[in-house]
Amino acid sequence: MPARRAAARGRPDLPTRAPRGPHPAVARGGDAAGRHPRRPPPAPPAVPDPARYDRMTYRRCGTSGVHLPAISLGLWHNFGSVDPFDTARAMLVRAFDLGVTHFDLANNYGPEPGSAEETFGRVLRHDLRGYRDEMIVSTKAGYRMWPGPYGEWGSRKYLLASLDQSLRRMKLDYVDVFYSHRFDPGTPLEETMGALAHAVRSGRALYAGVSSYPPDATREAARLLREMGAPCLIHQPKYSMLAREPEEEGLFDVLADEGIGCIVFSPLAQGLLSDRYLDGIPADSRAGKPHGFLRPSAVTPERQAQLRALNDVAAARGQTLAQLALAWVLRHGVVTSALIGASRVAQVEDAAAALGGPALTDDELAAIDAALGGAAARR
């Protein structure tokens, strides 16, 4: 040891170095290099139930070779960046356990727009990566996603740019179904259908579909897609006990004529056709949230009286009101699948259990119509 260092060590008037403590990052739970705090390990990937296909009914989609589960899960609500990820993950995993193989999205689902696709992609990568070929994943484009004239509706530019963005958000190479989300009266139908057909030919989608198209436009869209070599697989209209336009205005007749499948959205009328609103508006319900499409004004005393009457019909069948509503839409021969939303796992399980009930009788159908008091009262 050099003499100077030895002398310094022996001098009591020189300061001594304090004992080293942990690096500040380590004290916060990070590593010694100060990179970041330690995070709890992620949950292990889900292991799907081997009996899942025994629990679900599958229906042929129009005249195609595709079969869809009678109950499909939509990510319109409760899967966005404002919603708890763990709940969203649990619902997706449980749905797959119950034989739900179809997951329906759109570019604007959230909120924030696009975040539902990000959530789905995250769950798919972590929990269900090895099961992609057992799923039908659909997305749509049509509503506003970015500023300017190319951020919505049905132009080729918007649709194909939106599809590419959706694939990036989900980190997928393709979707099974790509929809035009709404009919665009300002764009030639040939252009919109041409974009869908191009998506199929390019391998970014396997099938084309349309949503919320009126009957005449649906028939013409089917003709165009057939001529372009990408037949229309499916139509997604709004349909429930409270919204019967698809059967009253001829859409179901067009779908039957054209051999197009049908998956109905809002079969529970945004959750109104459930036992949640029999006596009021729960704070944690869809109508009780500051965002969403079901507003408190829809839950009137008159509507609650109708819901209670429908609930009596359901109880007599040994079902919940939501299960009755699903059985009602699935009774129609054109309907391939009912697209449900959910905010918790129990709602997914309740919907799947609807398939175990008996077929609706003529007397029960008449009781449902009587409870709703005619067409004017349904809307």
Per-range role (PLM):
Residues 83-87, 115, 119, 150-158, ...:
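Alpha-helix N-cap and loop-to-helix initiation/capping positions
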Residues 8, 137, 259-262:
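Hydrophobic beta-strand scaffold residues
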Residues 42-55, 183-375, 379:
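Beta/alpha (TIM)-barrel catalytic core signal, keyed to glycine-rich beta->alpha loops juxtaposed to Asp/Glu
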Residues 37-135:
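N-terminal binding-site loop/beta-alpha segment at the start of enzyme catalytic domains
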Residues 2-37:
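C-terminal hydrophobic helical "lid"/dimerization subdomain
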Residues 167-187:
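Active-site groove signature of glycoside hydrolases
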